[in-house]
Structures are given as C-alpha cells and as structure tokens.
C-alpha cells in the first residue's frame, strides 16, 4: 500500500513468478555460502546434543499458515484460492462462497491506478497518493462500490421530475443510463478514462500504422486494442462491452436513481398553481439564479413575481406600483420607454380591474367564454389553458395573473415553458381574494430540446376553477374585442416578429440527409435491413434506424435523430455553398439556394414518437451503401417513446401466473425464472436479462432456453443448476456455447403488455437469381444424404464434469483419431457442452504440437520380430539355430580348443603317433569304422568327420604353418 503506484502492472506480473524463484535461488546460495564460511567454527554434533535451551515453539500448534499458489489475476480472494480479472465474476464468487464473511472478502479497486485491496486500505492509499491538497475537503463517492453521498444538491428544477438518473457529484440528470455513465466517465473519471482511451498515434509504434478502409484509425482502446473511427464509437465500446464490465461498477456509485431522490429539497414543490392565500411566494431556482423578493396581496391587488434573469416576461404589481422588466425586454425597448414603464403610475379601477399587460404577438390569443350565472353569487368557472410551443430563438413566456392569485414559478435553464398570455387582455368582473383551486395535478411534456444537457419541458393543458361573480349572459374575451386603457404601456408591434412568420417557421418540417449503410433498397416501397436480414415495414423502420446513422460529411455515427440534426446544423450547414455542391456531386441530393433539401416524392411514410423528432415532422433522405436514396416522411406520433416500462404486466409470460402488483411480478421472475425485465440498449425494446451474468435474452425466449442457460451459466450457484437439471434436463444436441440460442416462438407469448407491437415483416421477394439458388440448394440437399456419425470414444456423463476433465477427454479422443470431421466437432461440442470453436481449437493445437515435434525431433523406429511367430511362417529360407558362445578367461589356455578331437581308424593309429605335432593330451577314441560316431568338443566347429584323404591334407597344412 505504501509503495508508489507503478504503471504497466500487467507486464510486471508476467515475470513476477520467475523473479521470485530466482530470488529464492539467490537466497539459498547465500545461505549455503555462509554455512561453508562458518563451518570451521562448528563444534560438532556432540556439543549440540549436550546443549540445553528453552523451547521457544511452545504453544505452536504445528500447522503452517496455508499459502495459496501464485495468482496472476488482479482480484484475488483472501479466503480461498480463487482469482479473477472481472469485478462481477469476483463479486458473484463472494456472494456464493463467502456470504457469511463478506466484510473479510470484500475488495476495492482504486479508480486512479490498478491498486486493489480492502476498503480501508484503499481509502488510505487514495489519501496518500491521489488526494490533492485543493480537493482534500471534497467527498469522493467513486471510491467505494456501496457509497451514498452525504450531501445532495438542493437546486432542483421542474425538468428533473421525469429524469430517472442524477449525478451525485454535480447534479446533472438524464433519463438514459448510458448518457449518465458517459457524463460521469468523461467529467468525473478523467484518469480512469485515460486507461482505456488511446489515440492512433500511440498505437502506431506498438502495432504499426493501423489502416481501416484505406484511412488511418484515429482512436483505439488501450486494453483490447479495438480501433474506432470516432470518440463516440470508442466511448460506446468502453461503456457497453463485456470486456470492460468492471468499469460499470466503478461508475454506478456516482449515479443516483429516481427512488433515491425523494429526499432532495424541492422535489415535491416543483410547481404549485393553488397555494393558500396570504402565503409568501417561494422561488426554487438553480445556482445561477437568485431568489427574488416576494410580495403579499394588498386589497385586490395582483401578486406577481419577478422571474429569472433570462426570462422574457413583463410583470407588474398594481398595489405597489412597481414594474420589473427582464434584460431581454429592456434590450428591445428604448431608454425612454423603459423609464416610462417603470415610473408610470398604475391606478386601480374601482371595479377591481387589473392592469393591462402588453404582450408579444408571438403567442396565440386566449379565448375565455364566461357562462351565464346569477348576480352576486360566487361560482367556479372551469378554465382550460392550452400551452403553445415556442421555438428556441423566440421570446420567452409572458404571464397575466388576475387579482388574488399567487403562483410559485420554478426557475429553469435555457428554453422556458411558455405560459398563457393575451394581447391587451382585461378582466372587467370583480374578483374576490380567493385562491385558485386546481382540479388536477400539473403535468410536464418534454419538448425534445436540451440546453447544456438539461432537457426542457412545456406544460400540459390544465383545468382550473376560477371563483368569479356573475356577469352578462355570455362574454367572449378575444383579441379583437379587447380595448386598451389609455394609461397602459404598449410595446410597438414593429419591434416584434410577425405572428405568421413564427407560426410558419415552427410548423415547417425538419430536413435531414444521412447515410444508412445497413439498409438495402429493393424497390420504391420495400427496404431490407442487412444487419437483421429482414424486410422492413413503414411502422417499424425507425427502430432499425437506431443501428447507427452516419454523417454525409464526416465518419461520425449517431444513434439519435436529435443528435445528428444538431450536428448537421452546426458543423455541416447546407446554407454553405460548398456543402450543397458536395452532396450534389457525391450523393446526387438537390438543394435550393437557402439550403433546404428538395423532396420530390416519399417512398415510406411512418409515425414516430414525438420525443424522438423534436415534436416536428421530419423529411429524411437515407443514402445506402450502393448510393441508392430512400425518402421517408416521419410524422410525430402522440405516443411518447417509452424508455421504461410504463405498466407492468399482471401475468407471467412464461407460466401464466396471475400477479397482483409489479413487485410480485419482478419477484416471481427472479425466484422462478432467474430473470429480470429490462430494456434493450440499442433497440429500446422490452427484454429480459439473467440475474447472475446479466446476459440479455431476446424477447422470444422460452422457459426451456432460460433453464438451459441457467444450467450452463458460470455465475449461477451450483444448487440452482442442480435444481434446473432436475426440472428441465438438457436433451438438446446443438448448442453453440455457454449461452444457448433462443428458440423462436409467437411474439404474443412473450411481449409485455403495453409494449408496441409491430407487424410481421414481408417475405423476401423471389427473383430469378434467388429461384436458381433455391433450386440448386434443393438439388444438393437431395443428392447428399446425411450419414450418422459414430464417435471413437463415447462421452457418456462427461458433460457434468469439470472443464479440465472434458479437455482431457478431447485429448484422449485426439490420440485415437487426430483428424476429425466437422460433424464430429459439432457432436462433441453438443455432448460435452463446450463451444465448437473451443473443440476445434483444441484439436488444432494438438495437431500443431505434433507436427512441430516431428520437424524438430528425429524419430528412430526399431523393428523387432518374435521368433516364435516367425517360425510359424511357411517359407523356403533356412535359418540355422545358433547357440551363443560362452566367454572364457583369456589367460586360461585350453588345449582342446587348439586341436579338435579326431576320430581315426585303427590301422592309422601308428601313423598318427609318429606325427610331429601330435599332442598326447588330446583324447583319441579308436573305434571300428562302423561304430564311428560324432564326438562333441569345445571347438568352433562342433561336429567334424575326417576321412583319410582329408587327414593328409590337414597334415600338409599344419606343416606349412609351422
């Protein structure tokens, strides 16, 4: 812990075991040298035996502390031999095996360096090496996996109500988890991002210049060396890849979900249209806004508040005679007009008439119809307010409030929610000091825009009851029927843009031209998705556009219509002549002089949720990889694009069990099916994920496929696996890995209630080329019948053994049959529950080792024969049986071996006796000629029969040698 953090720790861990063994050898050698040095001072064993001393090992049990072998992984369990590189895998191991001692097995990773230790030690390590003096007082919620921030930002705005996630450090909020993770990683974990983010220049010296599609790669991932064309690609890979799953658990502590935000100050007071009378008005604003001074009602005067510094609203108070002008309004008016507005007297009419608010003609007028009611009778009048939508460059809201009304206005950032105004509106009836009573809660509608990452909202239509006195039988308050009082301040209409121009600009559809390389145009009404390999319909095409839209001018990819529209307007505006010429030459897209795309016709018309299209129509021109153009007209639908489950189903889609509430539904899925409902990260469709390994199932999974996955899941507990094997035994014969493929089933059995249902895609058109291909495939299928495959070794019961045992079985199978067919590999993979790629790689590695060994080593084969078996063969060869010769002492002279024993006739004895080389010691047997037999002796020639003629020749030879 007290060592300075070292970089390139992965390279140091590889030779660490070897270095440790070398140091042990060096230490042993030093001990031996020291023993030799002091050997002369040794008094002997007698002195050692006669020495007495106290045993210092008293109390030692004799058991040595268990020392685990060296583990090269970064996360090592201190309670057993287990080690892992992935944080989720290590966490699941602790929960499965050491759930009774979680505190002792808990580890914590340093967010700045690869240091890993217990939480207390890691906190000290961070304070010693990574804590800057200027940031010593700040809290670090990213240092622990289960840390809850002590202080929460109290600056809450109305747009945070629909956002599910909030940053615990800076208060940034969004409804998408990916956006929040990206924000935390880029803004609060810059050091951690540097471990993954790499430029193309950094990877060039290591792996050479990386070139992809003819262009050099700009970015890459430092850990897995994945190249990326843009920063968005690299960030998406870092945050969503399973290889970097440990990054998720370091970022999530900085993200607070909506359930954790219920204690934030001001969340329950987002907007209150009916406060109690005679109460001070409070204003909750963001840090860059200061709370304004509040006023109470005096008589029948109107209580109005000064808005934020950037709100384009004109407020007046008749009782106090004060008027507040926003900076934007002051900029539009001259200096004399501003002084006249601020200093002008505002007398109150006897009948309780409110002051006239001259407003901008940007907003539609408000028509109020007063029903007929008796005189002097307080009644409630339902008042429906419709909120029009303003584009960002237009002026902000202007508010007219009748006397006796108090409003709490939350401060907002950027584009503000437009409130109801009318041009020169007067209320000629007397209004008592009674509060407004809202008949329903306030609801916000997202506009689709974001300012500094903060989404903007507008008010939904609200019904309120206004206590008024009776008046004429029917009174219609409209713009053309309202007269202005003589002492009212009126803004010159020439200073404001015309209403018609603003309405035309707001109602004009957006235009966009992008590349969609994954689409293929079949005809004018048919489009095929090459990635999903299906034909697309009009209603479901926008789901496939989320695969990624590429800019026409740069290689950036986008996964949202709003993002690519904003990028195109800022970076590649078609108002520039060069950009118009470029798309006309490269993609044959026509534009007018103002930079608007020309759409002569549309191939497809579809409805898209309005929160995806900025609540405006979109004319989309898609350019495919073959430069074909697809023109689509997109209409904003009323239904919002749901990013989360709005209504949980009350029946399980797998076992049809009726449930009462969403909590029981999720608990049932977790306990019985081991899954939880989720949303697909890219397609934004309902899906399920495993509670052990977080793997996402397709929406057409069955209970059988889920059970098989749980049996093979490496993160699932053993008890759960055994229970699933008993309930649903795996009898399938074709699996492609640990996660089995989902079986197709009707969509009605799995889809959620309330989820969008899309019509089935059309069948692919049959062309002559496809027909020839199909007929050719059918012919080949009939000519080649499938033959049953027999395995050399039967893997009976091996699928439930360990992975090493199954590899040993594959090695034995290789020794029996090194060259296997494709069908054998598939059968072995299905029988052993191993991936086909792993089986094939195992056989290839074994074969490669054998071939290399044959090339390097010279093999000598010695052939031997069994003589017993050879003698049984029938042949014409004569193979004599030779007895082995006994070796004798060379110093001992055996005379019998010099001259062999000779058998002669009786009449030849005298002649033999007179021979000069006759040796008397040689035994001579004299027998009759008919009784002459063979005599054995120790000479090399074992059996000799000598005739008289041969004896004479022998004598001559002996004489010659002598």
Swiss-Prot record:
Instruction: State the protein's name.
Output: Activity-dependent neuroprotective protein 2a
Name the job this protein performs. Answer: May be involved in transcriptional regulation. Required for progression through late erythroid differentiation. May be involved in vasculogenesis.
Q: Is Repeat found in the keyword set?
A: yes
Name any Gene Ontology BP term: regulation of gene expression
Stretches the record annotates as Disordered: 753-781
Keyword terms: DNA-binding, Homeobox, Metal-binding, Nucleus, Repeat, Transcription, Transcription regulation, Zinc, Zinc-finger
* Annotated region of DNA binding: 795-854
- One GO CC annotation: nucleus
Organism of this sequence:
Danio rerio (Zebrafish)
Q: What InterPro entries does the record tag this protein with?
A: ADNP/ADNP2, ADNP_Znf, Znf_C2H2_type
**Where does it mainly reside?**
nucleus
Q: Give the taxonomic lineage as stored in the record.
A: Eukaryota, Metazoa, Chordata, Craniata, Vertebrata
Loss of function: phenotype = Morpholino knockdown has no effect on overall morphology, and at the onset of blood circulation at 24 hours post-fertilization (hpf), blood cells are present, however between 33 and 48 hpf, blood cells are absent, and embryos develop cardiac edema. Hemoglobin undetectable. Some embryos recovered blood circulation at day 4 after knockdown, whereas others became severely edematous at day 4-5 and died by about 7 days. At 28 and 48 hpf, expression of band3 almost abolished; embryonic alpha-globin1 also significantly reduced at 28 hpf.
Q: Where are the zinc fingers (C2H2-type)?
A: 75-98, 108-130, 165-188, 219-244, 527-547, 549-572, 650-673, 688-712
Location in or out of the cell: Nucleus
User: What's an example of a GO molecular-function annotation for this chain?
Assistant: DNA binding
């Amino acid at each position: 812990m007290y060592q300075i953090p070292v970089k390139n720790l992965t390279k140091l861990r590889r030779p660490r075991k070897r270095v440790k063994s070398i140091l042990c050898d060096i230490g042993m050698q030093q001990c031996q040298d020291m023993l030799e040095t002091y050997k002369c001072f040794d008094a002997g064993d007698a002195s050692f035996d006669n020495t007495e001393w106290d045993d210092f090992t008293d109390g030692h049990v004799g058991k040595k502390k268990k020392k685990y072998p060296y583990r090269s992984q970064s996360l090592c369990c201190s309670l057993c031999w287990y080690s892992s590189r992935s944080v989720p895998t290590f966490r699941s191991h602790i929960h499965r095996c050491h759930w009774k001692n979680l505190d002792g097995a808990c580890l914590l990773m340093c967010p700045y360096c690869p240091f890993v230790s217990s939480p207390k030690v890691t906190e000290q390590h961070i304070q010693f090496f990574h804590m800057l003096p200027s940031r010593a007082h700040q809290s670090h919620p990213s240092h622990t996996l289960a840390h809850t921030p002590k202080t929460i930002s109290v600056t809450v705005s109305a747009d945070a109500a629909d956002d599910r996630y909030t940053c615990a450090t800076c208060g940034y909020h969004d409804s998408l988890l990916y956006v929040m993770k990206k924000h935390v990683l880029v803004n609060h974990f810059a050091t951690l991002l540097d471990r993954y983010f790499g430029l193309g220049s950094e990877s060039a010296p290591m792996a050479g210049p990386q070139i992809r599609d003819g262009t050099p790669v700009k970015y890459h991932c430092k850990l897995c060396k994945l190249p990326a064309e843009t920063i968005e690609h690299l960030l998406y890979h870092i945050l969503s890849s399973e290889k970097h799953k440990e990054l998720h658990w370091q970022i999530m502590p900085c993200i607070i979900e909506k359930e954790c935000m219920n204690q934030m100050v001001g969340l329950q007071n987002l907007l209150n249209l009916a406060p109690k009378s005679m109460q001070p008005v409070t204003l909750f604003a963001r840090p860059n806004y200061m709370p304004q001074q509040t006023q109470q009602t005096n008589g029948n005067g109107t209580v109005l508040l000064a808005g934020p510094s950037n709100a384009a609203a004109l407020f007046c108070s008749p009782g106090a005679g004060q008027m507040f002008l926003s900076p934007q309004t002051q900029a539009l008016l001259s200096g004399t007009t501003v002084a006249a507005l601020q200093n002008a007297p505002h007398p109150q009419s006897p009948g309780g008439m409110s002051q006239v608010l001259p407003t901008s003609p940007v907003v539609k007028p408000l028509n109020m119809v007063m029903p007929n009611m008796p005189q002097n009778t307080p009644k409630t009048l339902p008042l429906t307010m419709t909120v029009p939508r303003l584009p960002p460059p237009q002026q902000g809201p202007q508010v007219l409030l009748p006397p006796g009304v108090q409003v709490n206005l939350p401060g907002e950032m950027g584009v503000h929610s437009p409130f109801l105004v009318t041009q020169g509106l007067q209320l000629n009836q007397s209004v008592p000091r009674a509060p407004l009573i809202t008949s329903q809660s306030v609801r916000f509608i997202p506009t689709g825009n974001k300012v500094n990452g903060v989404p903007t909202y507008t008010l939904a239509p609200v019904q309120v009851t206004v206590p008024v006195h009776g008046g004429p039988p029917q009174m219609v308050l409209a713009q053309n029927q309202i007269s202005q009082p003589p002492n009212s301040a009126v803004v010159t209409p020439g200073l404001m843009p015309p209403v018609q121009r603003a309405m035309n600009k707001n109602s004009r559809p957006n235009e966009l031209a992008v590349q969609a390389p994954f689409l293929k145009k079949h005809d004018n009404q048919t489009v095929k998705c090459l990635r999903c390999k299906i034909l697309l319909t009009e209603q479901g095409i926008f789901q496939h556009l989320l695969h990624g839209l590429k800019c026409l001018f740069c290689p950036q990819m986008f996964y949202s219509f709003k993002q690519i529209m904003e990028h195109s307007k800022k970076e590649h505006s078609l108002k520039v002549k060069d950009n118009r010429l470029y798309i006309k030459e490269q993609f044959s897209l026509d534009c007018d002089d103002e930079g608007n795309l020309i759409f002569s016709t549309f191939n497809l018309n579809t409805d898209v949720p309005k929160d995806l299209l900025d609540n405006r129509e979109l004319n989309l021109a898609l350019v495919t990889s073959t430069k074909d153009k697809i023109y689509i007209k997109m209409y904003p639908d009323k239904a919002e694009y749901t990013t989360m489950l709005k209504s949980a189903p009350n029946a399980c889609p797998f076992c049809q069990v009726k449930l009462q509430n969403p909590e029981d539904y999720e608990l049932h899925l977790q306990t019985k099916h081991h899954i939880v409902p989720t949303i697909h990260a890219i397609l934004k469709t309902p899906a399920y994920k495993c509670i052990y390994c977080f793997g996402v199932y397709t929406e057409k999974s069955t209970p059988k496929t889920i059970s098989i996955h749980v049996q093979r899941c490496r993160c699932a507990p053993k008890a759960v696996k055994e229970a699933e094997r008993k309930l649903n035994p795996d009898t399938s014969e074709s699996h492609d890995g640990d996660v089995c493929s989902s079986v197709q089933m009707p969509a009605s059995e799995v889809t959620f209630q309330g989820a969008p249902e899309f019509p089935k895609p059309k069948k692919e058109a049959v062309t002559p080329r496809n027909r020839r291909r199909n007929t050719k495939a059918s012919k080949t299928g009939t000519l080649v019948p499938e033959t049953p495959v027999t395995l050399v070794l039967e893997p009976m019961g091996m699928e439930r053994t360990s992975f090493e045992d199954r590899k040993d079985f594959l090695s034995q199978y290789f020794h029996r049959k090194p060259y296997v067919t494709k069908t054998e590999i598939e059968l072995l993979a299905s029988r052993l529950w191993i991936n086909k790629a792993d089986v094939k790689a195992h056989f290839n590695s074994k074969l490669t080792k054998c071939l290399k060994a044959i090339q390097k080593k010279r093999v000598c084969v010695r052939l031997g024969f069994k003589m017993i078996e050879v003698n049984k063969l029938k042949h014409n060869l004569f193979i004599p049986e030779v007895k082995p010769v006994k070796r004798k002492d060379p110093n001992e002279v055996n005379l019998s071996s010099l001259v062999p024993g000779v058998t002669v006739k009786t009449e030849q004895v005298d002649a033999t006796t007179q021979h000069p080389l006759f040796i008397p010691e040689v035994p001579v047997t004299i027998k009759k000629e008919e009784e002459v037999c063979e005599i054995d002796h120790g000479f090399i020639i074992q059996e000799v029969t000598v005739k008289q003629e041969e004896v004479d020749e022998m004598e001559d030879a002996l004489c010659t040698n002598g």
